[in-house]
Amino acid sequence: MFTPTLDARQVRAVIKELRGIDQQIVKDLRSDLRSQLAPVATQIAGAVPVDPPLSGFRNNGATGWSPVKGKVGFTPGKSRNNAKNLVAIRVDPVGGKRGLYIAELAGSRSAGSTPSGANLISVLNSRSPMNGRGGRYAYKQFRFLRPDVVKIAERILNATFAKIDRKID
């Protein structure tokens, strides 16, 4: 079976070569990745409910619920946590509220260490169950769309490599 993968180390090496050839090609690559993956980021952000999943998230404090926005980032260099991602799709709440992060990740590592935490996780699981690990809303949608993201990124990278080949020849 064929599994499409992007090796970030090879891409970083290519980008290093690109910088030596032409900065405009790197800018075009970033622009193409952002523009082509923006609809996917919007689709992932659309999987997050607008209304809070529990009444406790309906507040104006730091743990409140707020609308979310999908963003696409391009990371050609080394990341801070040694991740090997080429493209980062983030779903961030507007206004810096943390309710999404709490609801998204609650129960991903444990069943809750306090009775209130266990209750939060059980109610969230009854309303929107978490499949495996990762997340309840945005990450679940990302896992569904990941093959499309890989195909789009590969298509853009192949087009960029073809441009470089034409330029070198």
Roles of regions detected by a PLM:
Residues 1-8, 47-169:
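Charged, low-complexity interaction tracts
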Residues 1-27:
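N-terminal, Lys/Arg- and Ser/Thr-rich interaction peptides
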Residues 32, 36-44, 149:
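Non-globular disordered terminal and juxtamembrane segments underlying protein topogenesis/assembly
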